[in-house]
Amino acid sequence: MKSHAGKTADPSMPDGAPALPRESVLPREYVTLLNSEFELCWAGGDRLLDEICRYAMAPGGKLLRPILLLESAVAAGGRAADVLPAAVGTECGHVASLVHDDIIDGDDTRRGRPAVHRAHGRDNAIIAGDALIFFLFRCLADCRATGVGDDRIVSALRVVAQAGYDMCHGQSLEAEVCGDLSCDAETYLEMIRLKTAAFFRAACQSGAILGGGSAEAVRVLGAYGDHLGAAFQIHDDLLAYDSTPEQTGKSAVSDIRNRRLTLPVILAYETGSAADRRTLEDVLHGVQNDTIDEDAAFRAVHRVLERTGALEASRGRARWHSSRAREQLAVLPSSPSADRLAHVARLAVTRDR
């Protein structure tokens, strides 16, 4: 692995924003630059690990975490070029979590093609995920070459390390309540705060820190990231029912197959009739004992979620977090970057993948 991040950064990267189409969350210049940096990171590497990391990183995803870091840095008064290495590393860390998640969940597809563990084997996938995590920290340290002070780099490292620790706790909590329909919404929200929102928060806070932002800017952008992460995860729960596998690039039955509790299922069990509750219990029991077809299980659950209003209630909760995320930005000076962050919060609950 070669850490090229930052070496091709253009200090004149635009702070203004072209109109953002629905499917885009970054100005085209940022997307192009980030993708170029990803290619440089693995260029020339002829070892198996390099090949697997290239496979994991491409095709690129939504690049949401890099946008949060880049735009948070600029919104806090810094320059995107100075924090580019950290943005590259943030995407590497995110991809690492996907590689490991697919192994834990037994999901065979990711972004419309075989998951890393299916393409290269379980052991190699674990190692590649680990390598991408460590590469994240190296990229953060590489911000020194762009002129970021050591004190800010150390602070950003601490924020990201804490987020990684929180993510592990969130993953553990998810395993603890797996298939337990008595799990309440409060426990679920704590789980996604740890598992998902923590890394959103870290991307925003580390961008603000590395960009030279004030303590208030770091706090506000962290709160924005918390609410954005919650909105994003709840909407993710809904995509299985609102989108197709072709749109999402992953199986619609993954949550049910893994007996993973989502907000719609929790709300349906809390508010549903005795018959609805029994249906959910029978489905999870059948999946656990392999006595029910996965597609039939999905259809049965979908009917219960529609009948109880759990899908619409979950959409409302996601929209509430999206709104709260946007409210945090009011404290920051008006800027194109703050506007783009607000756009991301809206996009988080309107996307179809």
Please provide the spans of the model-predicted regions:
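Residues at alpha-helix boundaries and the short loops/turns that link adjacent helices
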Residues: P59, L63, G93, D150, ...
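Short, charged, amphipathic alpha-helical segments
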Residues: P21, V154, G222, G316, ...
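Mobile late-domain/C-terminal helix-loop "cap" segments
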Residues: R278-A330
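Short, amphipathic C-terminal "tail helix"
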Residues: G6, P14, R319-H321, R326-E327, ...
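Mg2+-dependent prenyl diphosphate-binding active-site environment of isoprenoid biosynthetic enzymes
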Residues: V25, Y30-L33, E39-R277, W320, ...
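Alpha-solenoid HEAT/Armadillo repeat architecture
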Residues: A43, M57-A58, E270, H285, ...
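A short structural micro-motif
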Residues: A163-D166, H227-L228, G286-D290, R307, ...
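N-terminal amphipathic/basic leader segments beginning at the initiator methionine
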Residues: K2-E39
